[in-house]
UniProtKB/Swiss-Prot annotation:
Binds 1 Mg(2+) ion per subunit. Pyrophosphatase that catalyzes the hydrolysis of nucleoside triphosphates to their monophosphate derivatives, with a high preference for the non-canonical purine nucleotides XTP (xanthosine triphosphate), dITP (deoxyinosine triphosphate) and ITP. Seems to function as a house-cleaning enzyme that removes non-canonical purine nucleotides from the nucleotide pool, thus preventing their incorporation into DNA/RNA and avoiding chromosomal lesions. Its cofactor is Mg(2+). Its EC number is 3.6.1.66. Disulfide bonds: none annotated. GO terms for biological process: nucleotide metabolic process; purine nucleoside triphosphate catabolic process. This is dITP/XTP pyrophosphatase. SUPFAM superfamilies: ITPase-like.
């Protein structure tokens, strides 16, 4: 089975590719010559994932899945949420996003947060959603050099290491994206 993962983010692609069973040939957007930036115009994480999956299916004809992820901080009423990637501006700068979030949390005691990933699968024109959530808290400063996005400041519940301190295999077992992806794989194996 050929399946396109609708992302231009090489870190996301690498993270998911490591989890794909051998009977699925995972293709990237560049593999199908999709070089355009698919605009995320949805008001929710679910909508953004669906927009990307629908775009690839409708324009390229491939079965496809797409994800969108948001970091939801309790004391910020769920922000940055759907705007996580461009929290500090449209440039999608991880460092600037982290700095802005840490600044906003400086005088707050409640640092609880969760990552939420929604994967939209468009298979033969039918769409299904798979959700993964990882609860944790925002650290006061960055730790670790692995991962991407908010990984250096996210400490998952029950762990002493940030996502950026974990090996990819360890992170994938507990991460929001790993949880959603395992749901997707379970669905595809039926």
């Amino acid at each position: 089975m050929k399946l396109v993962f609708a992302t231009h983010n090489p870190n996301k692609f690498r993270e998911i590719k490591s989890l794909v069973p051998k009977h699925i040939e995972l293709l990237s957007l560049s593999d199908i010559n999709c070089n355009e930036d698919i605009e995320e115009t949805g008001d929710t994480i679910d909508e953004n994932a669906m927009i990307k999956a629908d775009y690839v299916r409708n324009h390229y004809g491939y079965d496809c899945f797409a994800d969108d992820t948001g970091l939801e901080v309790h004391s910020l009423a769920g922000a940055p949420g759907v705007y996580s990637a461009r929290y500090a501006g449209d440039e999608k700068n991880d460092e600037a996003n982290i700095e802005k979030l840490l600044e906003q949390l400086k005088k707050r005691d409640d640092r609880t947060a969760r990552f939420k990933t929604v994967i939209a699968l468009n298979l033969k024109g039918n769409q299904n959603l798979f959700t993964g959530i990882c609860e944790g808290e925002i650290l006061e400063e960055k730790t670790g050099t692995k991962g991407f996005g908010y990984d250096p400041i996210f400490l998952p519940n029950g762990f002493e290491s940030s996502f950026a301190e974990m090996e990819l295999t360890e992170k994938s077992k507990i991460s929001h994206r790993g949880i959603a992806f395992r749901e997707l794989m379970e669905y595809l194996s039926k």
